[in-house]
C-alpha cells in the first residue's frame, strides 16, 4: 500500500451488509445469519470482509445486522473489540431499530445505509465503501478506492467474471473498453455474455465505492421515485449508470494473492454444496485460498483451547488424519480422518471413520460411526454406529441430502432417528 492509498483509506468508512439469512444453506442458518457461518476451521464468513478492511487501512467500520443477529453480534464483540476510539478507530454494530417513522426493519441494502445516515455522517468520511458480509475473498480495498478517485466515477463497482449460466443470481453489467458501465441488470433471467466470451458474464461482487455526500444525494433522489425498492443493485446503481458515471473495478486488479495462489479467489458459499466444497478445498496440497498468508491475516475470535490431540495407536484404532485440517481443542481418539476439516473442540471416538467431513465446533462423533461427504452442524452428537454416505435413499430420508450427495446433519435430525 502506497502513501496515497493509505491516505484514502483513512478517509473512508466501510459499511458491511450482514443481515442476510442465506436461505439456500437451509438448517445451517436456522440459528445464525449467513455472515456468522463458520469457515476454514476457526473463522466466520464475516471475518473476510472485515479483515480486508483492516488490512487495507480502513479503521471506521459499520456492520448492519438483521436476521438472527445474536451469534454474529457475539462474535464481533469477542473477536473485533480491539478498535481504539482515541486512534480514530471504531467498529459499530448497527442492528435494525425503530425509527421516527415507526419502521424497524431494513427494507433493502440501500435502506440499511439510509437508516444509519446520522451515524455515518457523525464520523465524517469523505468516501464510503459498501461491502457484502457473506463472501470469501482477500482484497485490498485501498487499491479500489484509488481507482475510484482517479477515474472520477460517481460509483465504482467491484466485479468478477462468472460462468454465464450462474450469473442470474448477481447484478450483471456491460462495460466499454475503459471499464465504464453501460448497463446494469439485477439478477437477469438471461444474463448477457461478455464480448468475445460467450460463456462468461461480468457480475457485481456487491462492493461499491462512493463519495459519501454523493451517495446520500443520489439515495434521496431515488427514494422520491415511485416503486423505489431500497436496493443498491435494483435502484441506486442503475440510476447512476443512466445519468452519471459508473465504473467497473475488476477484482483481479486488487485481489490479494500469495505465490501459492494461482488465480483470484472469490467464493459465494451460499449453498450446502458450495460451503462443503470450499471448506474441503482448503485441505488440498496447494489450496486455491492461502489461509497461511501472514502478510494478509484473517482476523477472528480465537477460543482458548488446548492443542489438538491424537491418541491410540492400535490396528484399526489409530488416531490419524490425512489431508485434513484439525482445529484446537479437538481430540481424535482412535479414529481415522481423510480430507476432513474440523472446527474447534470436535471429538471423534474409537473405530469411527470420517471421509470428506466438515464439522462445526463441539460436535461429537461416537464409536464405529462412518461418515462420508457430510456437513455436521455445531454441537451435534453422532450416535454410535451411524453410517452416512453409503445409502443415498436412506440418507435422503433421514438427513438433508443434496443432488451431489452431500448430507447435512443437525441435532434435530439426529433426535428423530430410530436407533
From Swiss-Prot:
Gene3D superfamilies the record matches: Hexapeptide repeat proteins, Spore Coat Polysaccharide Biosynthesis Protein SpsA, Chain A
Protein keywords: ATP-binding, Carbohydrate metabolism, Glycogen biosynthesis, Glycogen metabolism, Nucleotide-binding, Nucleotidyltransferase, Transferase
Gene Ontology molecular function: any one: ATP binding
Binding positions for alpha-D-glucose 1-phosphate per the UniProt entry: 106, 171, 186-187, 204
Catalyzed chemical reaction(s): alpha-D-glucose 1-phosphate + ATP + H(+) = ADP-alpha-D-glucose + diphosphate
EC class: transferase
One Pfam family cited in the UniProt record for this chain: NTP_transferase
One GO-annotated biological process of the protein: glycogen biosynthetic process
PROSITE patterns: ADP_GLC_PYROPHOSPH_2, ADP_GLC_PYROPHOSPH_3
Protein EC: 2.7.7.27
Pathways per UniProt: Glycan biosynthesis; glycogen biosynthesis
Family to which this protein belongs: Belongs to the bacterial/plant glucose-1-phosphate adenylyltransferase family.
Stated role: Involved in the biosynthesis of ADP-glucose, a building block required for the elongation reactions to produce glycogen. Catalyzes the reaction between ATP and alpha-D-glucose 1-phosphate (G1P) to produce pyrophosphate and ADP-Glc.
Complexes and interactors: Homotetramer.
Name of the protein this chain belongs to: Glucose-1-phosphate adenylyltransferase
Organism: Roseobacter denitrificans (strain ATCC 33942 / OCh 114) (Erythrobacter sp. (strain OCh 114))
Source organism phylogeny: Bacteria, Pseudomonadati, Pseudomonadota, Alphaproteobacteria, Rhodobacterales
Amino acid at each position: 500500500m502506497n502513501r496515497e492509498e493509505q491516505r484514502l483509506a483513512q478517509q473512508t468508512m466501510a459499511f458491511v451488509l450482514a443481515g442476510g439469512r442465506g436461505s439456500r444453506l437451509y438448517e445451517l442458518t436456522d440459528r445464525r445469519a449467513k455472515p456468522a457461518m463458520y469457515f476454514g476451521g476457526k473463522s466466520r464468513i464475516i471475518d473476510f470482509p472485515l479483515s480486508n478492511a483492516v488490512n487495507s487501512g480502513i479503521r471506521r467500520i459499520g456492520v448492519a445486522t438483521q436476521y438472527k443477529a445474536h451469534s454474529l453480534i457475539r462474535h464481533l464483540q469477542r473477536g473485533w473489540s480491539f478498535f481504539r476510539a482515541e486512534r480514530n478507530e471504531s467498529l459499530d454494530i448497527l442492528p435494525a431499530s425503530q425509527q421516527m417513522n415507526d419502521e424497524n426493519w431494513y427494507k433493502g441494502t440501500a435502506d440499511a445505509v439510509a437508516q444509519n445516515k446520522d451515524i455515518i455522517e457523525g464520523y465524517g468520511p469523505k468516501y464510503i465503501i459498501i461491502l457484502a458480509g457473506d463472501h470469501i475473498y482477500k482484497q485490498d480495498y485501498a487499491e479500489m478506492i484509488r481507482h475510484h478517485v482517479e477515474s472520477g466515477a460517481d460509483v465504482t463497482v467491484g466485479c468478477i467474471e462468472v460462468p454465464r449460466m450462474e450469473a442470474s443470481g448477481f447484478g450483471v453489467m456491460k462495460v466499454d473498453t475503459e471499464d465504464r458501465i453501460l448497463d446494469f441488470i439485477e439478477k437477469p433471467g438471461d444474463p448477457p455474455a461478455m464480448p468475445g466470451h460467450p460463456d462468461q458474464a461480468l457480475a457485481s461482487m456487491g462492493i461499491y465505492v462512493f463519495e459519501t455526500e454523493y451517495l446520500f444525494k443520489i439515495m434521496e433522489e431515488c427514494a422520491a421515485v415511485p416503486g423505489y425498492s431500497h436496493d443498491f443493485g435494483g435502484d441506486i446503481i442503475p440510476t447512476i449508470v443512466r445519468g452519471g458515471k459508473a465504473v467497473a473495478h475488476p477484482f483481479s486488479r486488487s485481489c490479494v494473492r500469495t505465490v501459492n495462489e494461482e488465480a483470484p479467489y472469490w467464493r459465494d458459499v451460499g449453498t450446502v454444496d458450495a460451503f462443503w466444497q470450499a471448506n474441503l478445498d482448503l485441505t488440498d496440497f496447494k489450496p486455491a485460498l492461502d489461509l497461511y498468508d501472514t502478510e494478509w491475516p484473517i482476523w477472528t475470535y480465537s477460543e482458548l483451547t488446548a492443542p489438538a490431540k491424537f491418541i491410540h495407536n492400535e490396528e484399526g484404532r489409530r488416531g490419524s488424519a490425512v489431508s485434513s485440517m484439525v482445529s484446537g481443542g479437538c481430540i481424535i481418539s482412535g479414529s481415522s480422518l481423510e480430507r476432513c476439516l474440523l472446527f474447534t473442540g470436535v471429538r471423534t471416538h474409537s473405530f469411527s471413520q470420517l471421509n470428506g467431513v466438515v464439522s462445526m465446533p463441539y460436535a461429537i462423533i461416537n464409536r464405529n460411526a462412518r461418515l462420508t461427504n457430510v456437513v455436521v452442524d455445531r454441537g451435534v452428537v453422532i450416535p454410535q454406529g451411524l453410517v452416512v454416505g453409503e445409502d443415498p435413499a436412506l440418507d435422503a430420508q433421514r438427513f438433508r441430502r443434496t443432488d451431489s450427495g452431500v448430507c447435512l446433519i443437525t441435532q434435530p435430525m439426529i433426535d428423530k432417528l430410530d436407533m
